[in-house]
């Protein structure tokens, strides 16, 4: 289910979100 998918991918998702946030701040 969704919870299993999230648990499997959350570390990667968090990294991507952090990188996106940094890129957004740097571009601003």
Swiss-Prot record:
Which compartments does it reside in? Secreted
- Entry keywords, A to Z: Amidation, Antibiotic, Antimicrobial, Secreted, Toxin
GO annotations of cellular component type: extracellular region
Q: Which domain of life is it from?
A: Eukaryota
Q: What is its main location?
A: secreted
GO terms for MF: toxin activity
Where, per the database record, does this protein carry Alanine amide? 28
The free-text tissue note of the record is:
Expressed by the venom gland.
State the Gene Ontology BP annotations: defense response to bacterium
| Function, in words | The synthetic peptide has weak antimicrobial activity against Gram-negative bacterium E.coli ATCC 10536. It does not show antimicrobial activity against the Gram-positive bacteria B.amyloliquefacies S499, L.monocytogenes 2231 and S.aureus ATCC 29213, against the Gram-negative bacteria P.putida BTP1 and P.aeruginosa PaO1, or against the fungi S.cerevisiae, R.mucilaginosa, C.cucumerinum, F.oxysporum and B.cinerea.
Protein name according to UniProt: M-poneritoxin-Dq4a
The lineage is: Eukaryota, Metazoa, Ecdysozoa, Arthropoda, Hexapoda
């Amino acid at each position: 289910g969704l919870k299993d998918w999230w648990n499997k991918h959350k570390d990667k998702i968090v990294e991507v979100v952090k990188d996106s946030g940094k890129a957004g701040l740097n571009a601003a």
